[in-house]
Structures are given as structure tokens and as C-alpha cells.
Amino acid sequence: MPFQKPDAVDQHIISILEQNGRATNREIAEAVGVSEGTVRNRIERLIRDDVLRIVGVTNPAKLGLNTAAVISISGELSRITDIAESIAVADGVVYVGYTTGNADIIVLAFFPTNDELTEFMTQTLAAIPGIVKAETNIILKPVRSLFPGTTMNVVSRQPPTLAAATPS
């Protein structure tokens, strides 16, 4: 089935789920003014089309991740892809993107302390071939986060097991 651009109903459903990912189809249907079946079908399509993911959003500080950093990376152009891919799998990293301007890559990462950030900079990044410059900015106090779910896998890159994910 071809991709269908989200319409106003889809946007309303998405907006509700952004506020409460555990809202039931019935609750959403009542708020949007459509049937429960319509909500179910729309959510399934949005997920299938990779427009929507339903995830748990964590609070980094509550997980002991008190140091957040935005790191600008400049590198040898022939190695930018390899650099980005190496950084993307490092513990603590939640976002890696190519950029224009003064840096080639932007990284968002969370660590328990400044010492772990320093270790990341001096050991992890220093070991990646092709990095020419890394400029780190520590986030002193977040005002607003538009990245729900960004702290997924910052504690460990190991995926949760079924036993670990099942409430006791």
C-alpha cells in the first residue's frame, strides 16, 4: 500500500499519543470524534508507514544520567560515514546526525557524570580514525525536549530481555 500523508485526524491521534502513549483507542476515538476501529486502523497504518512509534520515554536525571552533552564533530570527509556509524553505537549516545556549517556531525549523549563524558571524549572518540575536532557543549538545564524516547539505550546497548521487560 502506498504511503499516505497524515491528515488532520492522524495528526490529532498523534498529538494525543504524544501526551499519553497509554491512551486507549476508545479514549482517542472519543477525543477525535471517530470510531474506535478508525483509530485502530489509523494507528496501525501510522506505525506500518514508520510515521509513529510507541515507546517509553524516560527521564535521564531519574536514571542517574546527569550530564547531557551536544558534541560537534569535524572529520576527514572521506571518513564521515564511518565516524558517524562508530559514534552511533557508543554507550550514552542517543542521537547522531550529519550537519552543515562548522561541524560535520552532531551528537547528543547522556552520561552519569562529567568524568564519564571526559572518558567518552578522551577514549571513545579519540580512538575513532578520521576525527579532526570535537567540540563539547554541556547542557546545563534543559528547557524543553522535542526528542521523546531519546534516552533509549543510554544505560546499556543491550536490548531488554522479555523477562526484564515483564513487570513482576
Question: Residue locations for each model-derived region?
Answer:
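A compositional/biophysical signature of low hydrophobicity enriched in polar/charged and small residues
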Residues: 1-168
